[in-house]
A protein has these predicted regions:
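Cytosolic, membrane-interface loops and tails of multi-pass inner-membrane proteins
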Residues: 23-40, 94-99
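N-terminal signal-anchor/start-transfer transmembrane helix
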Residues: 7-30
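Alpha-helical transmembrane segments
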Residues: 2-14, 69-78
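Juxtamembrane boundary at the C-terminal end of a transmembrane helix
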Residues: 119-130
Length: 130
């Protein structure tokens, strides 16, 4: 159970980190990746999704993971999709737009989240599916 809870904590911390960067640190996020001011709303929108998941995971850590498999399945599917889309974007024409600073973070971070969610689904299966 320690591996499961550690993975959940890492996912929660990561999501809260990105939520903060997107919602509170929008300007720094825009400047870091050269996305332009028009991206502010979408960045904040992404931040709200990260915040929602981060807060739900923190709640699960405090109350127990029994019956919460859907939360981690969603986390896995979303992160796996973003890994593919992020890789295509970082290695596609968007990355060549003047001023854009595409980095591997666009697919490496979601890949790590996907792996962590898979770890939770596998190591916590006995409790998650109860």
């Amino acid at each position: 159970m320690m591996i499961t809870k550690t993975a959940i904590a890492l996912i929660a911390i990561g999501n809260i980190f990105y939520a903060y960067r997107c919602i509170v640190g929008t300007r720094a996020f825009i400047d870091q990746y050269g996305m332009g001011d028009g991206s502010a709303f979408i960045i904040k929108l992404a931040g709200t999704f990260c915040a929602g998941l981060g807060f739900m995971l923190a709640y699960v850590l405090m109350t127990g993971i029994a019956g919460t498999w859907e939360l981690f399945t969603y986390g896995f599917v979303q992160a796996a999709l973003l890994t593919v889309v992020g890789y295509q974007t970082v290695n596609g024409p968007w990355a060549e737009v003047e001023g854009v600073k595409a980095t591997k973070e666009g697919y490496m971070a979601p890949a790590i989240f996907a792996v962590l969610n898979a770890v939770v689904l596998l190591t916590g299966a006995e409790t998650l599916y109860a």
